[in-house]
């Protein structure tokens, strides 16, 4: 008789035996099964929710145990749709944690059907509201040494975890209480994204870095951020409080902290890291009073909470929520008088309908209809106000940007103007049309200042116009908010290290004009170039090794520098950053980044806004004509530009 060790999704811990089987035979069968399934038994981890069985992979000559699809919350369906997450019910059998979970409900990007450069960001599993699951990668040796069940601090065999120190890169690392844990939060504009994407595979990071890596799904779009509480009587506030996607993240992080020892990790040695909306999520989890102090080390890639796309007011979120209700034929006018009826209606609407209809409120480049909301609870105030009273003396931050943050979004929002493969010679009138569209919510004075700042005065005007718009988008929405926030973090006591990724990878499928795209650094930080089956150049493999090392060193020490390497802390007074590049001729340290351009956004433009507000008033005082006002602005910018040449950045 063949005996299979394959397990169903949940197996009972014991099965009733027929009374006619003699006890000696039972023992023989038990010993035989133990021998056959012994390897699989090593893959069972006792968590606080129940036992889970993963799978073993060998990477770079090292064994890693991988657990995918561990539920951390009840499926947020039916009455739980739009509500805060509820912890998963414990299970008693062994849970099969070898398959990928569903992706939270979202729409696919299909502007370029069949194009792999776009497809890598689309869901690679079925979409479902039942999506709140965790993934864990744990080095096998460390997990078997330190892994302890959540109920006793011991190994399954009853022995205490040993106190050996592991060696990494020749440096002794004190892992007596377990390994460091890195927790990844994916991006996608709070509208899309999935922890299951191939680019987020952490096999190499866990194996080479000798760290535990985890990731999880969280709700996006209206399912994660519908905010209606202010419109309803107080007793209905929990029907759609908003920010439940952030509450999902918080619950997953707490679950991982509670179960760190079970996987061989140290719950006091945790680092959050993420990119774009995932980076802003890291920011939110570090700063929110709900999770403050839960983790004190974070890596933020191309995204901070002060970015225009990364937060919205309660009023704006309510406006968008009411529009969605009406688009779903559930009558938002009844929210105050009959909220139960409205929410019952919204919970009866097909998930696909909500997923599609929510995009009706997309209002222009990087103006997504869902974002973290200033709700008075998870986010009590706007990000920079929260920063004013923050005490961050024990916090370590690694943050940065890529060189061409804006081109990806420019292409998608103005697809009728640009080609993904070839550069476009853009006439001045089209340039002005696009710039006025992007910055249409700014005052006229601000728009004129922005256009002046990003007008090319040399070279081929047509191609330069395209490049300058990309720079304006990248600076405004990503690099300069990051720059501003990094300075504020340092001022509040955090230890901040800043990087700037400038390498255009040889594997890029996008046109040369798009440069170093938003998200291009992810594969390098995850160590993908170390995978010899992938087509990277030798210098790129070295860069991948260096960048993975920076992540690991930061997770272990709070400082991304390698032994003997200089990487000073970043501050407003000394804005030193580290350049990740394959070009050995480039100095690794510089000042900025983009200090002059970011001074325009962070220091000068707010003054233009205040001046415009003064002149636009309808008081009896004399006002400056728009023409003189704009000439004055242009003159001031010119003076600033002249002064820049005497500064070192």
Swiss-Prot record:
UniProt keyword list: Cell membrane, Disulfide bond, Glycoprotein, GPI-anchor, Hydrolase, Lipoprotein, Membrane, Neurotransmitter degradation, Serine esterase, Signal, Synapse
PANTHER family recorded: ACETYLCHOLINESTERASE
Protein name: Acetylcholinesterase
GO terms for cellular component: cytoplasm; extracellular space; plasma membrane; side of membrane; synapse; synaptic cleft
Topology in the lipid bilayer: Lipid-anchor; GPI-anchor
Species this protein is from: Drosophila melanogaster
Protein task: Rapidly hydrolyzes choline released into the synapse. It can hydrolyze butyrylthiocholine.
Phenotype for residue 328 to V: No effect on apparent molecular weight
GO MF assignments: acetylcholinesterase activity; cholinesterase activity; protein homodimerization activity; serine hydrolase activity; sulfate binding
